[in-house]
Amino acid sequence: MQTTVEPIRGTNDPVQSLELSLVVPIFNEEQSVGPLVERVAAAMVSYPHRWELILVDDGSTDATLVNARKYVGREGLALRIVELQRNFGQTAAMQAGIDTARGRLIATMDGDLQNDPKDIPSMVSELERRELDLLVGWRKNRKDGLFLRKIPSWCANYLIGRITGVKLHDYGCSLKIYRASIIKQVKLMGEMHRFIPAWVAGVVPSSRIGEMAVTHHAREHGVSKYGISRTFRVILDLLSVMFFMRYKARPGHFFGSLGLGLGALAMLILLYLGFDKFILGNDIGTRPMLMVGVVLLLSSVQMITTGILAEMIARTYYRDDASPNYIVRQIFDDQSQA
């Protein structure tokens, strides 16, 4: 059974008074999900507004979903579980949770107990005090390995800041607070969740994006889903971010500029060879430079053609961009348990 998540409409719906939705993607966290719910519930006792917890089960193959469902319908806990059809990845799971969220503010965090939900109320207060649209957690005293996690993270944060212009200490921290009206304008894709501040900067001024030091714990159960191979994927994603940040609405400019540059170089070479052939009378048929000029000219035509096709695809994407990058199998909440 596939379920389509519909946006909440109408001002008379009681869920409109929800202040905060906490979205937590989970994958094979059977030992962590119970303590996670308990800690979130305890941390939010002092929060004075209505809130909900949304767990997104990203195709777990262990007892994660079974253990999470035990808390549905618990008194004083507004819990919704979004079960995805299969494993779509953390970015898609986060997007599913954001699409499902009904609060005015949306918080996200990991489900491995390394983020501390006690930081959420103070982060909400800080977001409002500084009038921000996005507040990013900064794991100042990070409890991870130095060589496999910390050093690659430092390098990635530096590169992302340089490329995007949004300088933060910790892009990779999942603990973030957004205004729902802003984050719902951003469509996440691929494995771009770590670059969310950069995408948000395309919607609001970077001055409305801030950070705050948060608590970070060592992992208690299971093993990290991240390894050294993830670092190489981050580099590839970073190249994609650089392209989309600069050319997402006009990709033809990128390919066109490259094509024109190659074409100009090809014309210089061919004009020189033409002068050498027809004015000076030299034989150019066996000269390698002739082949270089022809290859550059053909590459120029190919780049310009690619730019035109990219423009057509981009226009089609922005016109028809409605399909989600995930499939929901079922949603469990108070109503489904009744």
UniProtKB/Swiss-Prot annotation:
GO biological process, alphabetically ordered: lipid glycosylation; lipopolysaccharide biosynthetic process
Keyword Transmembrane helix listed: yes
Keywords assigned by UniProt, alphabetized: Cell membrane, Glycosyltransferase, Lipopolysaccharide biosynthesis, Membrane, Transferase, Transmembrane, Transmembrane helix
Reaction catalysed by this enzyme: di-trans,nona-cis-dodecaprenyl phosphate + UDP-alpha-D-galacturonate = beta-D-galacturonosyl di-trans,nona-cis-dodecaprenyl phosphate + UDP
Top-level enzyme category: transferase
Gene3D superfamilies assigned to the protein according to its UniProt record, in alphabetical order: Spore Coat Polysaccharide Biosynthesis Protein SpsA, Chain A
Transmembrane stretches, start-end: 254-274, 289-309
Localisation per UniProt entry: Cell membrane
Protein topology in the membrane: Multi-pass membrane protein
GO molecular function: glycosyltransferase activity
Pfam families, alphabetized: Glycos_transf_2 (PF00535)
Superkingdom of origin organism: Bacteria
Gene Ontology annotations for the cellular component aspect, listed alphabetically: plasma membrane
Keyword Cell membrane included in the entry's annotation: yes
Knockout consequences: Lack of Dod-P-GalA in total lipid extracts. The membranes of the rgtE mutant are unable to provide the substrate for heterologously expressed RgtA activity. Cells lacking this gene produce an LPS that is devoid of GalA. They are also more susceptible to deoxycholic acid and to the polycationic antimicrobial peptide PmxB when compared with the parent strain. Pea plants inoculated with rgtE-deficient mutant show discoloration and wilting of the early leaves.
E.C. designation(s): 2.4.1.-
Record function comment: Glycosyltransferase that catalyzes the synthesis of dodecaprenyl-phosphate galacturonate (Dod-P-GalA), likely from UDP-GalA and dodecaprenyl-phosphate. Dod-P-GalA is the lipid donor required for GalA transfer to lipopolysaccharide (LPS) specific residues catalyzed by the GalA transferases RgtA, RgtB, RgtC and RgtD.
Similarity annotation: Belongs to the glycosyltransferase 2 family.
PANTHER family named in the record: UNDECAPRENYL-PHOSPHATE 4-DEOXY-4-FORMAMIDO-L-ARABINOSE TRANSFERASE, UNDECAPRENYL-PHOSPHATE 4-DEOXY-4-FORMAMIDO-L-ARABINOSE TRANSFERASE-RELATED
Entry protein name: Dodecaprenyl-phosphate galacturonate synthase
Gene source species: Rhizobium johnstonii (strain DSM 114642 / LMG 32736 / 3841) (Rhizobium leguminosarum bv. viciae)
Gene: rgtE
